[in-house]
Amino acid sequence: SKRKAPQESLNEGITDFLVELANYERNVNRAIHKYNAYRKAASVIAKYPQKIKSGTEAKKLDGVGAKIAEKIDEFLTTGKLRKLEKIRNDDTSSSINFLTRVTGIGPAAARKFFDEGVRNLEDLKKIEHKLNHHQQIGLKYFEEFEKRIPRSEMQKMEALILKELDIVDPEYIGTICGSYRRGAESSGDIDILLTHPDFTSQSEKQPKLLHAVVDHLESIGFITDTLSKGDTKFMGVCQLQKEKEEEEEESLHRRIDIRLIPKDQYYCGVLYFTGSDIFNKNMRTHALEKGFTLNEYTIRPLGVTGVAGEPLLVDSEKDIFEYIQWKYREPKDRSE
């Protein structure tokens, strides 16, 4: 997601600057390893129960190295960071960072538009004819997509989606994943995982199982735009309709993704797309220690030679935890 949930923590100043540096490394320098390093440090520090007093103290945490510790010292003594000031005052990086906030514009496209003289929303509107369909929609709803979705609205959308799924075919199973499932107070977008007993990894592709749902949600006015529609993944825009005519406020347009997953791979998918990223990494590492390889599709035992065997049967998230002998964790406890 383009926007991360706000972190409430004692070390917010530190985590904020680390996330900002991370995004700069990813979007402007295309340095994904540096992005990951900053994100990891931010995540560890966000969970640290005390207010950090020095870089040395921070360096004791796993994921905080010497360079990041130095930056923390500078931030704690001066209240700011020379590197960040420089980045913020640098037109290139601030423009590129801004352009990547438009859905459909990744770092490469942002760099290309920047080289063509595009700096802001007004400039983008002038070259709208050069944008692809996805980017045009990203531009059209830019202000709305920037706003986070309150949990109360997510709950309304979840209830509507599950009710309508049941109308299309009661055999569908749907789960809203992402930070919402972990209990977050707000979300950046809606991420739905969908499955049906007729669709397994052994069966033929079943695009109609996905398209029937999308078409139905379009017909009731919930899905308003399509960004892309493949056999197993739909990306688009949705909007809650007014419950009563007299409601003044229209709901905002929101980004929605619907993924159709084979039934036998569904719970590995739900686990993966619930996150968090850090939790997933830790769980995969633990699985490897126990002799299993875990990804968003399957969990498979590793042979002595390190070759993965056949996927194990999974009928719930709990099954996956049991295979790797890990105590089950409720979604709300999966932030790390």
UniProtKB/Swiss-Prot annotation:
Pfam short name (any one): DNA_pol_lambd_f
Signal peptide positions (record): none
Keywords: Cytoplasm, DNA damage, DNA repair, DNA replication, DNA synthesis, DNA-binding, DNA-directed DNA polymerase, Lyase, Magnesium, Metal-binding, Methylation, Nucleotidyltransferase, Nucleus, Potassium, Sodium, Transferase, Ubl conjugation
Protein name (Swiss-Prot/TrEMBL): DNA polymerase beta
Residues engaged in binding Mg(2+) 1: 189, 191
Residues at which K(+) 2 binds: 100, 102, 105
Organism annotation: Danio rerio (Zebrafish)
Described function: Repair polymerase that plays a key role in base-excision repair. During this process, the damaged base is excised by specific DNA glycosylases, the DNA backbone is nicked at the abasic site by an apurinic/apyrimidic (AP) endonuclease, and POLB removes 5'-deoxyribose-phosphate from the preincised AP site acting as a 5'-deoxyribose-phosphate lyase (5'-dRP lyase); through its DNA polymerase activity, it adds one nucleotide to the 3' end of the arising single-nucleotide gap.
InterPro entries listed in its UniProt record: DNA-dir_DNA_pol_X (IPR002054), DNA_pol-X_BS (IPR019843), DNA_pol_b-like_N (IPR010996), DNA_pol_B_palm_palm (IPR028207), DNA_pol_lambd_fingers_domain (IPR018944), DNA_pol_lamdba_lyase_dom_sf (IPR027421), DNA_Pol_thumb_sf (IPR037160), DNA_pol_X (IPR022312)
